[in-house]
Amino acid sequence: MATSAGKLRTLYSAHSSLSSLPPSARPTLQLATLRSYATTTPHDSPIGNTSNTPPTVKRPATAFKDKLNAGPAFSDFVSGKKDEPLDPAEAYALKTALVGPPGRKKEITRLPPWLKTPIPDSSNYKRIKNDLRGLNLHTVCEEARCPNIADCWGGSSKSAATATIMLMGDTCTRGCRFCSVKTSNKPPPLDPHEPDNTAEALSRWGLGYVVLTTVDRDDLADGGARHCAETVMKIKQKAPNILVECLTGDYAGDLDMVALVANSGLDVFAHNVETVEALTPFVRDRRASFQQSLRVLKAAKAAKPELITKTSLMLGLGETEAQLWDALRALRAINVDVVTFGQYMRPTKRHMAVHEYVRPDVFDLWKERALEMGFLYCASGPLVRSSYKAGEAFIENVLKKRKGGNAGSVNEKVTTSENVKKLVAGEAMR
């Protein structure tokens, strides 16, 4: 120990430059001197000559701070100076991004600002989600990754909370190129308790409007029509004041099953044509067709003329203006009451790509055109979905006005225990 101390004193006295420094600086320089003598490269100064040494690699945190310091200052963002407009190439660059691993990066188009929504966070949202898990129920809101889940489940001052329950499981027998719902030729069997569980959940939530949607079940003889109708009846028994909309499949073209669901006590019968006729073979499953969807909507109206019928079209798939006009004329010809327009948004990279992001003013234009053609109601906007804001005050008022004082008797007629038993036994109601 004494020998080491003596060596340090000798080393210190050998450099007169160190003795002239203030005491506080000496330990640092002394340590630097020791490090320089520990290397194999000779140095001409106590601190060492760095001309022959490799550059020092900065720690990630230090490099990040240096990058921030070299970036724009706060004044660059609050300056009152008006910037020059971007040229088309620069504007496009702001809407694209490179994603993927090094060497395999792909350029993708970023979402425009009008398609961005807040993160869901409300007591009503959390309560509905917990009940769904407890009763083993599914919603198309979650399965289809709907961007409006916070708005619909949370409700607002202008409309009641709306939930879309997905019946008959979470697996569809069809594989449409726009849809993110799971697909299989042999999905799990139906849950016999689902109608009761759905009615129980809805009676707890106190919703003003509920949408029941179904996966396609081509593996079932009736396509699941009786299961759907039984669920509607059970809901009306437990919560007679709730308004029920059914967003159904085409039941493989079986119009008797369409009539069965239409007469089950629901308030709105919805079936989506999804896109214009020319694009249907490229967008929907091969077992679906535009003309078959028209027949389904027409049969529902024929089975119950006072029933509101509804359909939806996605924009941004490559449709033309003339094709949209033709689709609307075909829908009005069969007395469809409500139509909605929404932007197609690609769920995953495995699904068909977006052809274009349609501007909000174009959606407003198609809403005006639809209303001028005689549709009872039209919801149109980038974030509108077939069941989005289905419980809007306008539709609720129309339904209540149509029912008037006979609402109770109509519901009682189709929701008696006797009719439920007949339905389960396979007897269609007439």
Curated annotation (Swiss-Prot):
EC number, as in UniProt: 2.8.1.8
Cofactor comment: Binds 2 [4Fe-4S] clusters per subunit. One cluster is coordinated with 3 cysteines and an exchangeable S-adenosyl-L-methionine.
Listed PROSITE patterns: RADICAL_SAM
Record-listed [4Fe-4S] cluster 1 binding positions: 141, 146, 152, 387
GO cellular component terms attached to this protein's record: mitochondrion
Region feature (Disordered): 39-59
One Pfam family in the UniProt entry: LIAS_N
Top EC class for this record: transferase
Gene3D superfamilies: Aldolase class I
Coiled coil stretches, renumbered: none
Chain intervals with Polar residues compositional bias: 39-55
Annotated InterPro entries: Aldolase_TIM, Elp3/MiaA/NifB-like_rSAM, LIAS_N, Lipoyl_synth, rSAM
Highest taxon of the lineage: Eukaryota
Transit peptide: 1-37
One Gene Ontology molecular-function label: metal ion binding
Catalytic reaction list: [[Fe-S] cluster scaffold protein carrying a second [4Fe-4S](2+) cluster] + N(6)-octanoyl-L-lysyl-[protein] + 2 oxidized [2Fe-2S]-[ferredoxin] + 2 S-adenosyl-L-methionine + 4 H(+) = [[Fe-S] cluster scaffold protein] + N(6)-[(R)-dihydrolipoyl]-L-lysyl-[protein] + 4 Fe(3+) + 2 hydrogen sulfide + 2 5'-deoxyadenosine + 2 L-methionine + 2 reduced [2Fe-2S]-[ferredoxin]
Cofactor(s) named in the record: [4Fe-4S] cluster
SUPFAM superfamilies noted in UniProt: Radical SAM enzymes
Record: residues binding [4Fe-4S] cluster 2: 172, 176, 179
Subcellular location per the Swiss-Prot or TrEMBL entry: Mitochondrion
Pathway assigned in UniProt: Protein modification; protein lipoylation via endogenous pathway; protein N(6)-(lipoyl)lysine from octanoyl-[acyl-carrier-protein]: step 2/2
Occurrences of domain Radical SAM core (ranges): 155-376
Record-linked NCBIfam families: lipA, PRK05481.1, PRK12928.1
Protein name: Lipoyl synthase, mitochondrial
